[in-house]
């Protein structure tokens, strides 16, 4: 019998950081295409995005675990969106003190100090929905099997009533 254990917080942080970094690059590439019709799709971000996204999504994971039985999905997504704005403002403000903030929303109509902008409310909300329903929920299902040998196939899935058990 395999002894599978949940991923550590550091392992989950790593997955969240890489996911956020990738999404940031893809979003900036798509934005460049929509705004400037640039077929090169130049996606860019900063290495700071790894820390920012990894930490933020790990905190949202904690929120999800506490709120999932208490709040409807849309309310949770509003809470996550508000958290995203607070986190983006806070990290941006700190990085700006060192001339290291990689974003500037000053050109947007509804920006605050160039660090956050209301124009991103819908993308942040949609991102929060995807983050909870796909990224966090599936990351929490991942397991380390400490008895598995590297390179060997996993043990066959357990059968339930003659069917492969997927949960």
Curated annotation (Swiss-Prot):
Domain of life according to the entry: Eukaryota
Record-level GO BP terms: macrophage activation; response to bacterium
InterPro entries to which the protein is assigned, alphabetical: CmpB_TMEM229
Phylogenetic placement of the source organism: Eukaryota, Metazoa, Chordata, Craniata, Vertebrata
UniProt keyword Transmembrane helix, yes or no: yes
Membrane topology annotation: Multi-pass membrane protein
Alphabetic keyword roster: Membrane, Transmembrane, Transmembrane helix
Family according to the record: Belongs to the TMEM229 family.
Region described as Disordered: spans on this chain: 148-167
Principal location: membrane
Location in the cell: Membrane
Parts of the chain that traverse the membrane: 15-35, 41-61, 74-94, 110-130
Organism from which the protein derives: Mus musculus (Mouse)
Residues in the Extracellular compartment per record: 36-40, 95-109
Cellular component GO terms, alphabetical: membrane
The protein's name: Transmembrane protein 229B
Pfam families: ABC_trans_CmpB
Residue intervals on the Cytoplasmic side: 1-14, 62-73, 131-167
